[in-house]
């Protein structure tokens, strides 16, 4: 469930950020594209580092750290008055997503019995696919009906649920 929620947040935000950057911050198309893409740069940087730190600190501590940074960086979307701040928040949010998703993958791989590894990894992957199926739809729907601030508050609430579920 944690993986589904983490990826749902990713898909909710990725489809609305370019629109928000253009409409609210008057970004050009390339600036809006950077605001979307810089998230993945943060994710890649985190994944390059996360494996080493998981070996040192352990999966659970890295998951908690990732969720904490994810929570803080998601709440920071409320305070993005310019493109530089939005890009910084996006990078940090992507970094947190990279830590969290790497930790959850490692935890799942370590707890599934070898005899059911294929089945377990399949279900884990299914949670990602389900998030990809509903996240963009919900993001656009919510942006037009409830607004940007509601989506950010909703994502913060989902991260809190992830934190509760990871204990």
Where are these predicted regions, by residue range?
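MFS-fold secondary transporters
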Residues: 73-77, 93, 166
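Cytoplasmic helix-loop-helix junction between adjacent transmembrane helices
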Residues: 89-127
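Conserved MFS/SLC helix-loop-helix module at the cytosolic interface between two early adjacent transmembrane helices
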Residues: 45-78
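Helix-loop boundary and gating motifs at the non-cytosolic
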Residues: 1-25, 30-32
């Amino acid at each position: 469930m944690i993986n589904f929620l983490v990826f749902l947040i990713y898909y909710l935000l990725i489809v609305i950020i370019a629109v928000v950057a253009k409409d609210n911050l008057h970004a050009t198309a390339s600036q809006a594209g950077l605001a979307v893409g810089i998230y993945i740069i943060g994710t890649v940087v985190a994944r390059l580092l996360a494996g080493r730190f998981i070996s040192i600190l352990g999966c659970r501590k890295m998951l908690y750290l990732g969720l904490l940074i994810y929570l803080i960086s998601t709440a920071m979307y409320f305070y993005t008055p310019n493109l530089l701040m939005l890009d910084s928040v996006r990078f940090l949010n992507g970094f947190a997503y990279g830590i969290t998703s790497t930790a959850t993958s490692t935890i799942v791989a370590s707890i599934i019995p070898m005899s059911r590894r294929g089945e377990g990894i399949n279900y884990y992957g299914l949670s990602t696919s389900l998030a990809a199926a509903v996240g963009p739809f919900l993001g656009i729907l919510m942006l037009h009906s409830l607004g940007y601030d509601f989506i950010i508050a909703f994502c913060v609430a989902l991260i809190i649920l992830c934190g509760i579920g990871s204990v």
